[in-house]
Amino acid sequence: MSAVIAPEAAGGPEQLIWALLAEVPDPELPVLSIVDLGIVRHVRQDLDGRLHVGLTPTYSGCPATEVIRIAVRAALDAGGYADAVLEEVLSPPWTSEWLTSAARAKLTAFGIAPPEEPVLSPRRLWQAPLVTCPRCGSRATERVSEFGSTPCKAHYRCSACQEPFDYFKCL
């Protein structure tokens, strides 16, 4: 038996681990931490006092998954938690709805349009997503390519300001 601890309810070593993980950047989106991204699913302590950190990959085959595990292990080791156990959590699968509001604001400030609609939006079944230009705020945007600088992004152009930008796809 163990307790799952969310960042806002954490105390003691769990709180320190959440703080350490909040400093680990996503390798493909270094403006975001892995906590901002929502891939840290839990920090829990078992009955023996051993700490467990659950990580969910953004999608199967994400090339950053192993790099993230290495960075998390390094952060935990440097923080004095070398015996913490890393766990891969595949269910439920990660969704872009787990991006924090801070993550969405950081993406926009960095020039990447965050997803705006729920993943299971009925409109998304038949139409392209609504994408707001992160530079000028216009909705007059068009997809240039389904794939941007990384597989989780698409490349768009704003018809109003004529600037190209990446859009973080709903996953």
Predicted regions and their residues:
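A short amphipathic beta-strand at an alpha->beta junction
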Residues: M1, A74-E97
